[in-house]
From Swiss-Prot:
Keyword entries, A-Z: DNA damage, DNA recombination, DNA repair
Protein name as it appears in the record: DNA repair protein RecO
GO terms under biological process: DNA recombination; double-strand break repair
Entries under Gene3D superfamilies matching the protein: Nucleic acid-binding proteins, Recombination protein O, C-terminal domain
Organism: Xanthomonas oryzae pv. oryzae (strain KACC10331 / KXO85)
Cellular component terms (Gene Ontology): bacterial nucleoid
Length: 240
């Protein structure tokens, strides 16, 4: 199959043999596409190497043969965001998450839209944690894994003052045990869930619980195998 003049975001790049690269690209029309870029070294290929960088929006043409497509041409369509510190790790995170969850050669336009919005959010230096929670929510929705953020697993309206545990299959489970309700490591406030559903940034004190709860749900859909970016973020937090 011939892929011509397709737009996509570079998610991941790694060396293959001595002169080639394996590139994962997220596209709107073809989903996640694996590209084999041959012979990318040398001064005449400098522009191509510069285009094949994570977070970069490119336009490319390729021939699909089996699992990988043979790259014919690629060019950068803009300047990738220059991220440093926490935002750089966040950029790594959004790319790694979709590298793991976006299906190969199966278009999910919602995921392309999620990545576009998250990339813009990172470049604009907006509140980082909130941008990532929105991204996670939208990715789950795009993959068909969304849960009700207005009602709990029993169909009752979520109580802002109560605490809940997010279950990947059942949604928000209200915590009735006083001991568990006080354990903020495993639960999230109803106020935070309602805010997430209404696309309003929760209170600062509710953000850690929301992060942990969303990570637990994502871990389920990742098959129980975490992300390298999570390890990097935790290591950075311990060093501070």
């Amino acid at each position: 199959m011939l892929i011509e003049h397709e737009r996509g975001f570079v998610l991941h790049v790694r060396a293959w043999r001595e002169t080639s690269l394996l590139v994962e690209v997220l596209t709107e029309q073809h989903g996640r596409v694996g590209l084999l870029a041959r012979g990318v070294h040398g001064p005449r290929k400098q522009a191509l190497r510069a285009a094949l960088q994570p977070l970069q929006l490119i336009q490319f043409s390729a021939v699909q043969r089996g699992e990988l497509a043979q790259l014919r041409q690629a060019e950068a369509l803009d300047t990738a965001p220059r991220l440093v510190g926490d935002t750089m790790l966040a950029g790594f995170y959004i790319s790694e998450l979709l590298l793991r969850l976006a299906p190969r050669n199966d278009p999910v336009p919602e995921l392309y839209a999620c990545y576009t919005q998250a990339r813009t959010h990172l470049a604009a230096d907006l509140p980082l944690a909130w941008g990532l929670r929105r991204f996670e929510r939208d990715v789950l929705e795009g993959l068909g894994f969304a849960f009700d953020l207005q009602h709990d697993s029993d169909g009752q309206p979520i109580d802002p003052a109560a605490r809940y545990r997010l279950d990947p299959e059942e949604g928000a489970l209200r915590v009735l045990s006083e001991r568990l309700a006080q354990d903020r490591r495993e639960t999230v406030t109803g106020a935070a869930l309602l805010a997430l559903g209404e696309d309003v940034m929760p209170a600062a004190e509710d953000m850690p619980g929301l992060r942990r709860s969303m990570r637990s749900v994502l871990l389920h859909h990742l098959g129980g195998r975490g992300l390298k970016s999570w390890e990097m973020l935790e290591d950075l937090a311990r060093r501070r």
